[in-house]
Each structure stands twice: as C-alpha cells, then as structure tokens.
C-alpha cells in the first residue's frame, strides 16, 4: 500500500466512510461504509455505474443502510475505527485494477469493482441485484470509453458526451420532438453534405425563427425512422451544449480539457456520432483567454478538415457574417445551406402538423380557420419576426389564454358569489333589528339569498361538469398520443405483436372513447366555457402584441365607424370634405378593402392657420385610440437643416447616437398603429421629403441600423399653410413649387381647408366653452352663456390671419379671468350657476 495514489473522490469516500463508522460506534470500517460513502457522492461514478447495469442506486442504498444498522457497535471506545479485512482486500484489489488498466490513480470505480470481487455482504448484495464483477467491468469500460485516470479528478471526463450534450435521436425515439413538416429540400441537402468524405459539415443559415433547429430535429426523426441513406443509418445525432461546458470551468485549460474529451469521444466513435451546435457562432472565442488564441473554433478546425468530426451548425445571417466569415479557415470547412422563410401556405401546413401537440398540451381544440388566421395575420401585422415562429407563438398564446379562462372561475359565478356575500352581510346587520320594516326586509332578503345560493350551486355544478368534460377529452388525447408513440417504437424495434395489439386494439378503443367524449363536451348551447380556439382568439392576441385592431368588426365598432364624420365633426368645424376623406380611409382599412402594402391613408392638409388642420389629426387619434395624445407628432420646423434628416431615421454607423434609433422610426416601431402628424411640413429641408417617399408608397422605412419599420398601419398627415388665403389654383401652384411631383403623387389626397364663417365660429365657441365647463365641473360650477355672448366671443375672437386660435385666449381672458377673481374673493361657491352676458356697452362680457 506504499504506492497507493487515490483520486480526490477516493479520498473523500474513505474519509466519509471513517466518519460514518466513528459516528455509528462501529469499531471497523466495513465494505458497507465504503459503498454508502460512494453512493452519497453527488457527482460520483458509483450511482451512474449501477444505473448503467440496470440497478436502481436507491434500492442498493436502502439495503446497504439496513446492513449497516446490523453491524456491532462498541461504546466507550476512544480509538479510531480501522479498515476491516474485507475493506483492506477491496482497496488492494482496486489498486491492482488501476495498475492493470494503466491508470496513474486509484479511483472510486476501481474500489466499486474491488468491493464486487470480494466475499463480503456488499459483494453478495451487488451480485444479487445483477451487478456482478464482470457486468460492472463492462459498464465501467463503456462509461470511461478511451479515457485513462491521469489526474486526481478524472470523473468529469467520464460520460463527457452525455454530460455536455443532448441525444436528439433518443428524444425522437421517445416521441419528445415536435413533428417537422416540409423542409424536405433542406434536409436532403444536409444529408448530402454529411455523406461527403471530407468537410462534411453543413451549416444552416437563415433569419431567426425560420426553422433551422427544426430541420436538424427532422434529420434526427428520419435517422430513427430509417429514412436516410446507408451512410447515416443508425447514427446518433447529439446537440452539443457549449454553455454547460464553459459553466464552472474555473481554471485555465479546464474548458479546453472538457472539449477535448468530448471531441475524443466523437472521434473514437468512428463516425457513429453526428454533432449539432445551435448558435454556431458561439464557438468563435469560446474558452479563449486574453493571451491565447486557442478557442473552441480553432480546436475543432483540424477534425473538421479531416472529416473526423461531422458537425451540423445553425446560425443567423448576421452572426455568420460577423463571426464565421471573419475566420476564413473556419468558414471554408463548412458548407452553407440557406434556410428561407416559408410562405404563408407552407406555414399553414406546418401549423396543421403541430396542431395535435398544442391541443394535447393546452387541453383545448384549435380550429383550422385559427391556423390559417395565425399564418395570415402574423405575416400581415408582425413584421419584425419571421414565419413560422411568429405564427406558432400566436397559436400557442391563444390556446394558453383560452386554457387560463377554462381554469378560472367564470365571471357569471363571480358576480353571483359577490351578490350572495353582500346579502349575507346585510342579513347579519338586520338580524338584531326589532322594527317591522327591518323584519319584512329580512324575510325578503332571506328568500332572495336562498334563490341566489341555489343559482350559485347550479352554476358551479355546470361549470365543474363542463370543465370535467373538457379534461376527459384532454386525458384521452394524451393517452392516444402516448399509444401512437408506443406503436411506432414497437414497429421500429420489430415487436410486431405489440404493434398490432396497439394499432388494432387499444388505439381504436381510445379513439372510440374520444369520439363519444367530444360531443359531451359540446352538448349544451349555453356553455359557460369556450374550449375552441378560433380566428377571433388569434386576432385578439395580435391586437395585444401590436395594438392593431386585427379582429373582426364588432357591432358597436361598425356603428361607430359609420357615424365617424359626426364624431369628428363635433371637434372639427366647417371642414366636411377633409373629415369625409379621412373617415373613408379609416373605414377602408378596417373593412379590409384597402391596399395592404400602403399606409391606411396619407393626406396633405393645406389652408390658413387656425382652421382645424392639426385639430383634425388630434380628433382622429382621439376617435381611434380614445386619447388625442396617442399620435406621433413631428414638428417639421426642427428639421430645417440637411443633416437633421438623420434624426428621423437614426444616425448612420460610425456617428454618435447610432445605437439610439430615429425619433420617427422608434416611435412607430413601438406603436405601429397610430396617426403620424408632420406639422408645418413646408418648414422642413427638402431631403426630409425624400425620406418620406418610401413611407407614402410602400408603407415602410429603413432606419439607421438597417431595420425595416412598418408604416402600413399608420395614417401619415402632413399640414402646411402654403398659399393660404389664395384660390385653390394658387394654393396648388405653391405646393408644386415646394414639393416634387413624385412626392405629391404618392399622397392619397391633398385637402384644402376652407375659411370659417360666423355660424361655424359660434360652434367653435361652444366647443371651447364645453372644455371650460368640464374643468369647472370638478368644482360643481356651471356657466349659462347667452347667445349674444357667444356671438360676441365669435366676433372678437376670430382673426382672418390667425384663424380661430385667438378664440381660446379670448375665452380665458373674458370669462376665465373674471371667474378666477370671483372664486378667490369668495363671491362664487361650489354648486353655483353663473349667467354670462354682454355688457350694455358691448365692450366686454359680464358674469353673474
């Protein structure tokens, strides 16, 4: 034992065995102490060794614990426990095994074999469970592979591939991967590249969410099904996890050592293992230190070139360009396979293939029209992401929302429950009252309470029954999916008897139960729980994500849109043509007959100041979003210089503020359904109009970072007072002198606002007084303004040059100032009504 050189884990096991024997009062360290000490190690090799031979470690641990309890105990013994004869023999055998295997250290697996080869109770226990020395040795070689114990901490090199990777073929065999629909050409290209002699390393390049990882999962499913050429038959496809390989690597060289062990395992498999690395660009620089150029990418280059490592990678176009293309030696070892975004039709096919999985997971039914809506609406409205990922997410969230409603108490039950609680509180208050009225009320209340309790019980029972019926359907679908998976596995394994029993016996039986259960779940017409995901549910999720009303027009909204001119006319006076044009544009968009590749409507409002151009934009925002501030306002007077154009779309690369985005593009990205007001557009530099050309024609704009911002759901409104006061021909001549023909031609309409007549001014006075009245209502004050007073305000508040804007100032001065003085002097009190009339001399208004 002089040359005994244990590993760290071996030393820990011996120390733990000594402590266990000492604390239990055992005079000797027996083999059972050693076995338990090894099984207690969290990341030790003993438990995996037993699992490999089909023995449950917990069962062995429990039986060993019972053996330990039967050992003799010595009380009052101050000496330290010594190794027993059997333990010493096991350690000696372990040392001999280490020498035989050309290992430099004695490790816990050597000791495990030494215990099994002895004649102790532990040896009988292990052999009795099927862990004989021969079986353990075979498992030991399988776990260790080609590795030798050359360090004091060798355990991390065992089962390195299993530790730092996921077996996709095993997951596919167990039915854990989602079905892959389509993508046959891409999978065929991957198979072709993998079948090459050298540089057999395909890399899938495409935008995020187009299905690169799904293609690799599809390859794993084909390998399991045997639907691949002979060169890939029975191969293992593993997904390497570089994150877990880097995690916990505290010392320099530890990551490289882990990676080398994994690569050696792959190399010694003689082409049996195909490796997949998602986010392939992460290999560049992974594990590199400041002075060293040895990263994961450089470590795998030689194996890639020689064809010893068959690697499938997946990364996005930007990251491939940024990381892989910089290293020409690494890039030439890969064969690019471009993965494009599927069409809407292909996406519908993919969703149909995934439908069953999502129905089973959420326990709801998903209609085919919902799948079509998910593909179409995501393509139309969610422009920053890619199909099929965004469509799958829509279906998933819509089903999740419906499941949450099923699991929550219906609103109807909540309302009755609150009513019952209120009646019970009222009953407790009336019980002690002696007067006749209270007694009569108590009697009536108790009758109502009994009725409501009965109704609550009935509703709760109905809800529970409907919920149970839905859950039964969900459980049967889960059973059916499990049985189908078992049937496929039995066919692959050649167990035709089991496959026939499942296919022609148990599966039809469950299908029959499911057919009977589905009508039960839908039996009543007045169901409390909705269990079907339809197009409206998908549209609601789109609206929640983007703020765009993508759902069908509700009855209330239809009526609101039809009387849109009246609603806008309450705030914008005397501009019927402009109001009508804007209303038509909004109706076209909501009815779905507008061009989907252009903005909802784009207008140039012309006319003198103060006639309602900006007010119409505010009124439109208020009508659509119930908030007049819900619009993007760009004051074009701030963009009078050539270089200020960059503020709209963001600074170009290399300039300060490049990472901040543009004021216009960022605002529309955050709120894609909005009114965009370009106020006083004639004051902007002419280059600004060139930027707006793409917005008006194609409904999109590219910002300084190269991202496309979608303007198709916006209403761009440009206001200007060019040629104000002139005839229509003069106004249009002024417009043509400032704006280029291609700019004017892209607008939906150029609207010239008319001047205001006296009657319209009185209506504007009413609007201003109504706004003042809302502010006074907080103090319960009312104004009674006479018609002469309104005409006086209209006459004195209008200026042909300034339009109706001075009216607001006049209302504040003529009424607001007097009212403020009266309030401060205590002449007016809350709840008073103040008449407003013209003074006899006609010079001012008088209150009170």
Curated annotation (Swiss-Prot):
It is found in: Cytoplasm. Keywords: ATP-binding, Chaperone, Coiled coil, Cytoplasm, Nucleotide-binding, Repeat, Stress response. Disulfide bonds: none annotated. Residues 1-146 form the Clp R domain. It comes from the Bacteria. It holds the Pfam family AAA_lid_9. Residues 83-146 are annotated as: Repeat 2. One of its GO terms (biological process) is cellular response to heat. One of its GO terms (cellular component) is cytoplasm. Residues 342-547 are annotated as: Linker. Residues 6-71 are annotated as: Repeat 1. The keyword Ribosomal protein does not apply. Residues 392-524 form a coiled coil. One of its GO terms (molecular function) is ATP hydrolysis activity. ATP 1 binds at residues 206-213. ATP 2 binds at residues 607-614. Homohexamer. The oligomerization is ATP-dependent. Belongs to the ClpA/ClpB family. The Clp repeat (R) domain probably functions as a substrate-discriminating domain, recruiting aggregated proteins to the ClpB hexamer and/or stabilizing bound proteins. The NBD2 domain is responsible for oligomerization, whereas the NBD1 domain stabilizes the hexamer probably in an ATP-dependent manner. The movement of the coiled-coil domain is essential for ClpB ability to rescue proteins from an aggregated state, probably by pulling apart large aggregated proteins, which are bound between the coiled-coils motifs of adjacent ClpB subunits in the functional hexamer. Part of a stress-induced multi-chaperone system, it is involved in the recovery of the cell from heat-induced damage, in cooperation with DnaK, DnaJ and GrpE. Acts before DnaK, in the processing of protein aggregates. Protein binding stimulates the ATPase activity; ATP hydrolysis unfolds the denatured protein aggregates, which probably helps expose new hydrophobic binding sites on the surface of ClpB-bound aggregates, contributing to the solubilization and refolding of denatured protein aggregates by DnaK. This is Chaperone protein ClpB. It comes from Mycobacterium leprae (strain TN). The lineage of its organism: Bacteria, Bacillati, Actinomycetota, Actinomycetes, Mycobacteriales. The gene is clpB.
């Amino acid at each position: 034992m002089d040359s005994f050189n244990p590993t760290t884990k071996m030393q820990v096991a011996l120390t733990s065995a000594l402590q266990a024997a000492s604390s239990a009062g055992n005079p000797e360290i027996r083999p059972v102490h050693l076995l338990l000490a090894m099984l207690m190690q969290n990341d030790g090799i003993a438990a995996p060794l037993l699992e490999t031979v089909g023995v449950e470690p917990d069962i062995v641990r429990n039986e060993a614990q019972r053996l330990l309890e039967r050992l003799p105990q010595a009380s009052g013994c101050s000496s330290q426990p010594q190794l027993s004869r059997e333990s010493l023999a096991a350690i000696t055998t372990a040392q001999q095994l280490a020498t035989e295997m050309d290992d430099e250290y004695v490790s816990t697996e050597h000791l495990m074999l030494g215990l099994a080869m002895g004649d102790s109770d532990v040896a009988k226990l292990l052999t009795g469970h099927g862990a004989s020395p021969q079986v353990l040795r075979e498992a030991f070689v399988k776990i260790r592979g080609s590795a030798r114990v050359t360090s004091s901490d060798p355990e991390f090199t065992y089962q390195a591939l299993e530790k730092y990777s996921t077996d996709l073929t095993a997951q596919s065999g167990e039915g854990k991967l989602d079905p892959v629909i389509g993508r046959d050409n891409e999978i065929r290209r991957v198979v072709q590249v993998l079948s090459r002699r050298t540089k057999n390393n395909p890399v899938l390049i495409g935008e995020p969410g187009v299905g690169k990882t799904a293609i690799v999962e599809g390859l794993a499913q084909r390998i399991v099904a045997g639907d691949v050429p002979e060169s890939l038959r029975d191969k293992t496809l593993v997904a390497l996890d570089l994150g877990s390989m880097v995690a916990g690597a505290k010392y320099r060289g530890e990551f490289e050592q882990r990676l080398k062990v994994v690569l050696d395992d792959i190399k010694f498999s003689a082409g049996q293992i195909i490796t997949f690395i998602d986010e392939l660009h992460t290999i560049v620089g992974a594990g590199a230190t400041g002075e060293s150029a040895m990263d994961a990418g450089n470590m795998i280059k030689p194996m890639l070139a020689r064809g010893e490592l068959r690697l499938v990678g997946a990364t996005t176009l930007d990251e491939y360009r940024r990381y892989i293309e910089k290293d020409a030696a690494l890039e030439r070892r890969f064969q690019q396979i471009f993965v494009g975004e599927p069409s809407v039709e292909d996406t519908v096919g993919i969703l149909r293939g995934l439908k069953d999985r999502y129905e089973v997971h959420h326990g709801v039914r998903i209609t085919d029209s919902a799948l079509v809506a998910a593909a179409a609406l995501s393509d139309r409205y969610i422009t920053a992401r890619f199909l099929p990922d965004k469509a799958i997410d829509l279906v998933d969230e819509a089903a999740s929302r419906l499941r949450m409603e099923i699991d929550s108490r219906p609103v109807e039950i909540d309302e009755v429950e609150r009513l019952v609680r209120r009646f019970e509180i009222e009953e407790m208050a009336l019980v002690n009252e002696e007067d006749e009225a209270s007694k009569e009320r108590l009697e009536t209340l108790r009758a109502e309470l009994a009725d409501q309790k009965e109704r609550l019980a009935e509703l709760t029972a109905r809800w529970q029954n409907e919920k149970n019926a839905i859950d039964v359907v969900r459980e049967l679908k889960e059973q059916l999916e499990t049985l189908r998976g078992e049937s496929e596995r039995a066919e692959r394994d050649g167990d035709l008897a089991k496959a026939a029993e499942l296919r022609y016996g148990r599966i039809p039986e469950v299908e029959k139960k499911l057919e009977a259960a589905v009508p039960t779940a839908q039996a009543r017409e007045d169901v409390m729980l909705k269990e079907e995901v339809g197009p409206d549910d998908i549209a609601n999720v789109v609206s929640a994500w983007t703020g765009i009303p993508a759902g069908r027009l509700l009855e209330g909204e239809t009526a609101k849109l039809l009387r849109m001119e009246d609603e806008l006319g309450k705030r914008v006076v005397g501009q019927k043509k402009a109001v009508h044009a804007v209303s038509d544009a909004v109706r076209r968009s909501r009815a779905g007959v507008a061009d989907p590749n252009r903005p909802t409507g784009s207008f140039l409002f012309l006319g003198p100041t103060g006639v309602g151009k900006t007010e119409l934009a505010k009124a439109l925002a208020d009508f659509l979003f119930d908030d007049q501030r819900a619009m993007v306002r760009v004051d074009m007077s701030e963009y009078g210089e050539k270089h200020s154009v960059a503020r709209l779309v963001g600074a170009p690369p290399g300039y300060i503020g490049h990472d901040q985005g543009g004021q216009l593009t960022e605002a529309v990205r955050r709120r894609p359904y909005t009114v965009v007001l370009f106020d006083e557009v004639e004051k902007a530099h002419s280059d600004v109009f060139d930027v707006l050309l793409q917005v008006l024609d194609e409904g999109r704009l590219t910002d300084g970072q190269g991202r496309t911002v979608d303007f198709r759901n916006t209403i761009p409104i440009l206001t200007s007072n060019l040629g104000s006061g002139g005839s229509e021909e003069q106004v249009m001549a002024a417009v043509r002198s400032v704006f280029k023909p291609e700019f004017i031609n892209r607008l939906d309409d150029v609207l010239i606002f008319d001047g205001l007549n006296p009657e319209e001014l009185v209506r504007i006075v009413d609007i201003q007084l109504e706004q003042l009245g809302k502010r006074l209502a907080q103090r319960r004050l009312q104004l009674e303004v006479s018609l002469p007073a309104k005409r006086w305000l209209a006459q004195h508040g209008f200026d042909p040059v300034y339009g109706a804007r001075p009216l607001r100032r006049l209302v504040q001065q003529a009424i607001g100032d007097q009212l403020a003085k009266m309030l401060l002097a205590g002449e007016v009190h809350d709840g008073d009504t103040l008449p407003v009339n013209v003074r006899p001399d006609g010079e001012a208004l008088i209150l009170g």
